[in-house]
Amino acid sequence: KASDFAAYEKKKPFKQAEKSQEEHKEQEELWQMENWNREDLDGVEKKKKDSKPNNREVKKMVYSFRGGIHPGTHADPGYKSATNTKPIEKLALPDEVILPVSMHIGAPAKPIVSVGDTVDLGQPIAEAGGFVSAPVHATVSGKVKAIEPRLHPNGSKVLSIVITNDGEDRPHESVHPYDFASMSNEERIECIRSAGIVGHGGATFPTHVKIQSGIGKCDTVIINAAECEPYITSDHRLLLERPEETIGGLKMLADLMGVQNAIIAIEENKADTFPKIEQLIADDPRLHLYPLKCKYPQGAEKQLINACTGREVPSGKLPADAGCAVFNVDTAGAIYRRFTTGMPVIRRVVTISGSAVAEPKNLEARIGTPIGMRMRDVFEACGGFKEAPNKLLAGGPMMGNAQFSLDAPVVKGTNAFLAFAGDEDKRVKDPQCIRCGKCINACPMHLLPIYMNVYGKQEDLDNAVDCGMMDCIECGSCAYVCPARIPLVAQFRLTKGKIQAKRMAERAKAEAEKKKAEAEAAAKAENK
């Protein structure tokens, strides 16, 4: 309402008289979005759906979503200052690489080489184990040393192919450029599938599956350049140093999926990437740059779609059901490199940071090296630890996996290795909820964490589901703002596991009863 907005404006550090009418209107829209009044917001969402502003117009509006948190400090939002100005450095080749056959969501890949085989750079060494799967390629040339379970960043032991590096980097005969323009869609998708390209943002969903399921359903492609996780700056540096790869991949995706609206969404704290991005997209009217408010989890798929298009992904559905397909910065880059060089997924840029790291950096070994390098090698390249780390993470501090060993390899979904000193790992024994409601305000999915936690502890699974337990994206916003320091996400993961186990048991019981009924019916028919 205008009266509420006037009161809100008085609290702002700028004077209303200094703002133009157009700026006033834009600020009002942002105010409505942050305060989430359903009736007021409908008009803003309708405007987003019905209009496709050009690049110059869209730059004036900052897009966001309701809820979320602001990790970091005023001087250092997101704790990114340690590495956001550090150029990508290439790491020396390791003596051996460890390549898990499961670096993606879906069925593990199946090894197609044997111990003692000589392999070349980019050679397929494991084939996809199903439709939702991805092949694995040799990231160095050399000899297969072992095929055995090795430690994975997820904490388990996974069948892995260990290759001893011969230092020659002989490219495999299958590595050659492809003519994207002359290929059919089926050939393009097969080319992406055979390259082992998966989501590089952490989810590692096979890219060819996302593309194939989205063709005909999606009218918008979004490149997720939010990189909202604290400390991580690998995507930021890629956009600064190799923006042509990401934009080239975005154009290919737009052609492949037949969409006329292709968005690259970047948080405001990466504004130094805007000039080059605008220059690269200026000649293609399908492409748009959308600045995003610096907020976590702005990069979560559902929140990003809502911020950019005003659409909401229905509960239990996929982004394609909202007409959108979302890809990571380096996923788009991997697609571009596949067609222009023929190289499959064999490298990864990783941010190394945290209070215990001597020299925080953004690291990438020369082509073919990072996938399979050990965590220990990566930290040593950053000068080791300036003090003993109390917490090691693969990924960001909000959604990453805690590590108990430095021997886990870099995999396709690894975007950071973080090491923190003891004073940053604060725990409370037997925390008690004070019912302040901060977790509800922070939840980007509009859930009720306060009740989800209670039902989870009581193992009241039906009520937990009714509160939206299975819609939780485990972003950690609720746990971050909790003054009692309750490990909410840990409880939610445990409860979701119980719900899934219950559903599987119910399905198995129903199938057994169905088979029993069919057998009884068949027996009666025989008796007749």
Predicted regions and their residues:
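Ferredoxin-like iron-sulfur electron-transfer modules
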Residues: 2, 16, 21, 32, ...
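N-terminal, Lys/Arg-enriched amphipathic/low-complexity engagement segments
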Residues: 58-112
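Short histidine-centered loop motifs in beta-beta connectors
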Residues: 109-118, 122
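Short hydrophobic beta/alpha edge segments that flank linear recognition/processing sites
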Residues: 119-133, 148, 159-165
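Conserved hydrophobic positions within beta-strands
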Residues: 142-144
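Acidic low-complexity segments
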Residues: 146, 151-205, 215, 271
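Hydrophobic alpha-helical positions that pack around
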Residues: 260-373, 381-386, 396
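Ferredoxin-type iron-sulfur electron-transfer modules in oxidoreductases and energy-metabolism complexes
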Residues: 414-430, 440, 444-523
